[in-house]
Structure formats: structure tokens, C-alpha cells
From Swiss-Prot:
Organism: Yarrowia lipolytica (strain CLIB 122 / E 150) (Yeast)
Protein name in the entry: Diphthamide biosynthesis protein 3
GO process terms (BP): protein histidyl modification to diphthamide; tRNA wobble base 5-methoxycarbonylmethyl-2-thiouridinylation
Main location: cytoplasm
Boundaries of every DPH-type MB domain copy: 3-59
Amino acid sequence: MSFYDEIEIEDMIFDADQGILTYPCPCGDKFQIALDDLKDGEEVAVCPSCSLMIKVIFDPEDLEQFEES
């Protein structure tokens, strides 16, 4: 699997209402990944508008900051 980029979780934006993290995609949309998917070990965020994917770099303890939001 090839990734457009590898992004640190700290650089992503958390939407507490939807429970997702986003990051701007070059196509103009946003890469998205659900917090629950990250908890399950998923690390690939996809863009719904194009075929690009990014790898989210994080440690499991990094997720705790979003649960407190």
C-alpha cells in the first residue's frame, strides 16, 4: 500500500461531534479517520473524493487526549 504522506496525529483536526480526525487533502477535500478506527489499530486515513491515503502516526496513549474533548 502506498501513502500520499505520513502525518502525525497532532497535526490533524478532531471533530468531537462526529468522532473523526481530518487533515487537508491536495484535492480540496479532507482525509478522514474515525477515532474508533484508530482505537482498533487502523492507521490509514482516506479521502472520500480521491484515491489518496495517508498513514496516521500515533501512539495508543495519544488517543486519550481526544476522548477528554
